[in-house]
């Protein structure tokens, strides 16, 4: 897809991977609609890109609410007349072992990380098909392919997001749709997703570790993020995926190696991993 002058909608666009996407798309000449719940950060990112010459607007949006996603689409079409790229990027996640996750946290993470992309596809796909072109990308995770420990609800939601996008792409190709799909499965990226997520939890407080092992696991997750890939690099990867209509977008080369080990274990003895 030629993206110069086209319109991209990015949820979770105020910071992290979403802001990296926005910067990459702006550099390619796209017009942008950024959505986020953090209105102060959203305004700062819109100002940054606008001052650099990008046509950009911001909209507060809770992707777990269908009416918010529909309002986002309406705002994009009203301002720019079309939507060519949708990035379902908004997400939340807090390290907690499966047996300790509160039911309200299960619902919260699945509402944002899975229902958010579902609402995005349901709302934006008809717009793109009517205009005759488009690309829908969803930010899943390596956790959507290989379920590690201490991230139960997040892993479940991200597995669902991968399933959504693989099925969508097959459906689109099966009926020769002009719209393409892709899924981003990042490894550790230098974002504040865990710290930011706490402020949006239903209980508005951090989960407490019930053991020293849980405390270390949570600290290890945050340390991996703090030392992770630059989100701007991820944004450039997604832009390239849109330009080339590539489905699988991996940030780290070891992703395929981990998948291969998992499949080898399955074939060998039905276990989760070998070695």
Where are these regions (language model features)?
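The beta1-alpha1 cofactor-binding region of Rossmann-like NAD(H)/NADP(H)-dependent oxidoreductases
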Residues: 39-40, 60-71, 103
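Active-site helix of classical SDR
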Residues: 121, 157
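SDR active-site lid
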Residues: 173-249
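Substrate-binding pocket helix/loop in short-chain dehydrogenase/reductase
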Residues: 97-98, 102-107
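Residue(s) in the substrate-gating loop at a strand-loop-helix junction
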Residues: 141
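Conserved glycine-rich Rossmann-like NAD(P)H-binding loop of the short-chain dehydrogenase/reductase
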Residues: 28-45
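Canonical Rossmann dinucleotide-binding motif of NAD(H)/NADP(H)-dependent dehydrogenases/reductases
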Residues: 2-33
């Amino acid at each position: 897809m030629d993206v110069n002058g086209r319109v991209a909608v990015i949820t979770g666009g105020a910071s992290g991977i979403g802001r990296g996407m926005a910067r990459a798309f702006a550099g390619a000449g796209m017009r942008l609609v950024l959505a986020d719940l953090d209105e102060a950060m959203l305004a700062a990112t819109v100002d940054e890109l606008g001052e650099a010459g990008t046509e950009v607007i911001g909209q507060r949006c809770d992707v777990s609410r269908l009416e918010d996603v529909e309002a986002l689409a309406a705002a994009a079409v009203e301002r720019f007349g079309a939507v060519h790229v949708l990035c379902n990027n908004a997400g939340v996640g807090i390290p907690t072992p499966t047996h300790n996750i509160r039911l309200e946290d299960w619902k919260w993470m699945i509402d944002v990380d899975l229902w958010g992309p579902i609402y995005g596809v349901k709302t934006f796909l008809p717009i793109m098909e009517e205009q005759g072109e488009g690309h829908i990308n969803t930010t899943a995770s390596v956790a959507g392919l290989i379920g590690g420990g201490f991230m139960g609800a997040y892993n479940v939601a991200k597995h669902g997001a991968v399933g959504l996008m693989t099925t969508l792409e097959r459906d689109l190709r099966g009926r020769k749709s002009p719209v393409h799909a892709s899924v981003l499965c990042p490894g550790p990226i230098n974002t504040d997703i865990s710290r930011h997520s706490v402020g949006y939890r239903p209980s508005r407080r951090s989960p407490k570790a019930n053991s020293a092992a849980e405390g270390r696991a949570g600290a290890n997750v945050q340390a991996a993020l703090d030392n992770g890939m630059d989100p701007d690099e991820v944004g450039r990867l997604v832009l390239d995926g849109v330009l080339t209509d590539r489905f699988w977008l991996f940030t780290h080369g070891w992703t395929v190696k981990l998948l291969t080990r998992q499949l080898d274990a399955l074939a060998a003895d039905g276990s989760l991993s070998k070695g």
